[in-house]
Amino acid sequence: SREELIISEIKKNPGIRFREVMEKISLSNGVLSYYVRKLENNGVIRTQRTTRVSRFFINDMTEEESKVVSRLRQTTPKAILVTLLENDRLEFQEIVANVGKASATVSFYLTKLVNDEIVSYKKVDLKKNYFVVEKKRIANLITEYHPDVVENASDNLADIMSSL
């Protein structure tokens, strides 16, 4: 059924956007809207709405996990998290160098990761050293929902994941 197709797609890709679901299972906007509303009302799925994006999750995922998975679907936050998992604590400029994006871009997403309580920092000699708050949980979510990250990452990250 269409409902099962939608649920299956959201399970495989938590944090998937409306348009992505529409394209992957070839449903029109109106038809998908109808089923999304129905599944939400029945408590099967949850929608995380921001000003520009709606993301869908199966209801068994916690709010915290949803935040992490949403960030992992974005290139720069994913790169920041992988960098911080590979290197225990880094200063801002070190993150910028590793991620390879403009400092303003890294700053924008790093602030979001800190606000989401996924990343934190400690001040050392007037500089902030950033780190992943719950390494094991983040590593597990990456392994479960983004195995490509582990496959494409350095051996260092693979070693870290297996040691946690």
Map each language-model feature to its residues:
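Short, cationic-aromatic polyanion-contact patches
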Residues: S1-E3, R17, Q48-T75, V124-H146
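Long, low-complexity, charge-rich intrinsically disordered regions
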Residues: S1-K12, A79-T83, S103, K112-L164
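Short capping segments at the starts of secondary-structure elements
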Residues: N13-R17, N87-E91
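Acidic (E/D-rich), amphipathic helical modules within compact regulatory domains
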Residues: R17-M61
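A short acidic, leucine-rich amphipathic alpha-helix
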Residues: E20-K24, E94-V99
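Short amphipathic alpha-helical interaction segments
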Residues: L27-K38, G100-V114
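Extended, charged alpha-helical interaction scaffolds
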Residues: R89-I95, K101, T105
